[in-house]
Amino acid sequence: MPWTLQPKWLAGKGLPLLGAILLRKTEKSEPQWKHRRQETHPYYDLQVKVLRARNIQHTDKLSKADCYVRLWLPTASVSPSQTRTVVNSSDPEWNETFPYQIHGAVKNVLELALYDEDVLDSDNVFSILFDTSTLQLGQPCTKNFTRQQDPKELEVEFTLEKSQTPASEVVTNGVLVAHPCLRIQGTVTGDKTASLGELGSRQIQLAVPGAYEKPQPLQPTSEPGLPVNFTFHVNPVLSPKLHIKLQEQLQVFHSGPSDELEAQTSKMDKASILLSSLPLNEELTKLVDLEEGQQVSLRMKADMSSSGDLDLRLGFDLCDGEQEFLDKRKQVASKALQRVMGLSEALHCDQVPVVAVLGSGGGTRAMTSLYGSLAGLQELGLLDAVTYLSGVSGSSWCISTLYRDPSWSQKALQGPIKYASERVCSSKIGMLSPKQFEYYSREKRAWESRGHSMSFTDLWGLIIEYFLNQEENPAKLSDQQETVSQGQNPYPIYASINVHKNISGDDFAEWCEFTPYEVGFPKYGAYVPTELFGSEFFMGRLLHFWPEPRICYLQGMWGSAFAASLYEIFLKLGGLSLSFLDWHRGSVSVTDDWPKLRKQDPTRLPTRLFTPMSSFSQAVLDIFTSRITCAQTFNFTRGLCMYKDYTARKDFVVSEDAWHSHNYGYPDACPNQLTPMKDFLSLVDGGFAINSPFPLVLQPQRAVDLIVSFDYSLEGPFEVLQVTEKYCRDRGIPFPRIEVDPKDSEDPRECYLFAEAEDPCSPIVLHFPLVNRTFRTHLAPGVERQTAEEKAFGDFIINGPDTAYGMMDFTYEPKEFDRLVTLSRYNVLNNKETIRHALQLALDRRRQAGGRVGG
């Protein structure tokens, strides 16, 4: 646990969770830690000697280049280094050596960038990503980096030796690495010459580059002579230094149309202390000499957290809460299946198929339809047979509203449906009332009081709160633990994706799951307790607790369709691919025989040479690929590193193309660009990647046998399945082939079954497109409509431009709401036998496999 916990965290839910965490540490055999292990790895001394470059042309072609090389190894240093600038030369030589100490547990990728210096701005000629794990100990290696049919080249010499620094212990799950965290605490006082309060306009600033904390300007205390405290947390592997700066605040007068005083900072002097030189757990005092005979006294103490002292979970198995839920839910599902399938006796727990129900995105249309689909499953007695219930965007609004009731699935759904109808069918003008605006302002001030700024996504969450409740909703996601504690309801999984700047969700998206117990990334095997989502973590340790956000803010994030870029808007709404943008992207060359080398050593990364885009091209890309808005959340993986062999881990689920992609800046093969290197998460609507949360239920640990997919979108009836099939094929995930007759794409049926008879690990998929087919003529399964009123009720358009159920339609007439709920319910009831057949297939697979399959 962190060294200091906030008092609010210790109250309420914090204390039970604290006890649970302490208990976990005493149970070494606990299954949820089976993928986390402690390892000891050595340090290595790496010497990088930048020799020379050849055939470098100046960008303006009127003079020769002024070249320098920038080196950046973020796993071993806190900031980039660079050579001197060699002016007016097409063939510059440097012969400069840069030493690094690298840790053997992490993937150390060196970035080398050749620049042509300009008066206004330096031009990046090309950049290189070099995996240092390819080097042999004690054997100097000279690399000539170039690309085919390009005369430009850079020559660099590498030497790798064992270090005299003792090996250190880390914690890893095979994808991420957590180092011990170094904490520096201390006080600063003026010494013999002056106290801090006597520095006048001068100010002392402390900074540790690479630390979690920002530079800290020290303000005198209210009582003269009292010391000023400081704290820094940093990775000791980076050889960090404490910088003490004496600065002066100057008031500069500007003459002109508006004569104003402007504060400017002038650096007067600077001193540094190497933090690795400090003894651990010992208090010591250092006198630092600054300008004009000033001395500052620093009383400091350094301590190191143990490598295993983490406040997040590193592992690829299911958390305790979900495991306990499954044990109880299987008993409920066994009895339900016995009733529905007419079995002579209840199933053994290992024979109970795992059924997941998925709801697609689609705004109010999806939310309303899911109520009807769940009502149909409940009427068939199948809701108790469902293990997981997951949704994207609008479907998540339905699910999260249902889970306000701890026993919602044990009651008739007419009550929740009526509640939803009253809100969907009412006027939304109240969200613009003075009272509501005062509420928005109050929430905004509350955010700002905690040091946050409210984003448009957060404001959207408050609007969704009004839309769903028309009053303040105090509920939090962790409250839903009560709804699954006895296995009484399906386990809810809410979906979002983490995106990176200037990359579409189609090209790169990291699925993030939200459950009552945990929030985390299956890709990294990194999870935090739901109560701690939004708090500040560094190197796996909780540094600052913030209260868990109310669920309305999560609902805004899960349904943040407006966070699209122009590129995604054209792609999703118009079906247009802006291929001309490819001309404005930089190019990538893999400079070694990558396919052959990957077979020999799957842990190594290819050497990549990037030719960056021009400033104009960057501006064009920014216009089309920057997101209109995107909420940012504290990154709980910040400060963790990628494991040395992460590329060979099956748990790190990425496309095989990622390792040899020529897509500029594709992050998975560039560990320095991956999420643990970021300060914040950018979480948006999962529909930007796949408009249904298939990736979250396809994890092998969940061993899902049958997926019941409800697609409420306005996209093609099989598009979400086809996108999922490609996603799975690219990543080696078992999934059935989606083969449909072209006629079905034009005029789809109500239900389709997809299964791979030869692959029992592939889930059975039962897919329900949202169509008005037999419902138009039938009041109920097998009962035709008779009266004009009955026929009129069933005669409506569900898809196309003339539908009343568009993505931007948030208010329905009562008749429109009833039609959509009734249609969705009917489509389930009318396919009772197909559902039973799918369940029978899942049961047969379980029996043939002797229990668990898919895992």
From Swiss-Prot:
The UniProt record lists the C2 domain at 27-145
Q: Give expression by tissue.
A: Strongly expressed in thyroid, expressed at intermediate level in stomach and at very low level in large intestine and prostate.
Ways its activity is controlled: Stimulated by cytosolic Ca(2+).
User: Can you give the residue ranges of the PLA2c domain?
Assistant: 304-855
Named cofactor requirement(s): Ca(2+)
Active site (catalytic residues): 393, 685
Q: What class of enzyme is it?
A: hydrolase
Pfam families named among the record's database cross-references: C2 (PF00168), cPLA2_C2 (PF18695), PLA2_B (PF01735)
Q: What does this protein do?
A: Has calcium-dependent phospholipase and lysophospholipase activities with a potential role in membrane lipid remodeling and biosynthesis of lipid mediators. Preferentially hydrolyzes the ester bond of the fatty acyl group attached at sn-2 position of phospholipids (phospholipase A2 activity). Selectively hydrolyzes sn-2 arachidonoyl group from membrane phospholipids, providing the precursor for eicosanoid biosynthesis.
Q: What is known of its domains?
A: The N-terminal C2 domain associates with lipid membranes upon calcium binding. It modulates enzyme activity by presenting the active site to its substrate in response to elevations of cytosolic Ca(2+).
What is the protein's name according to its record?
Cytosolic phospholipase A2 zeta
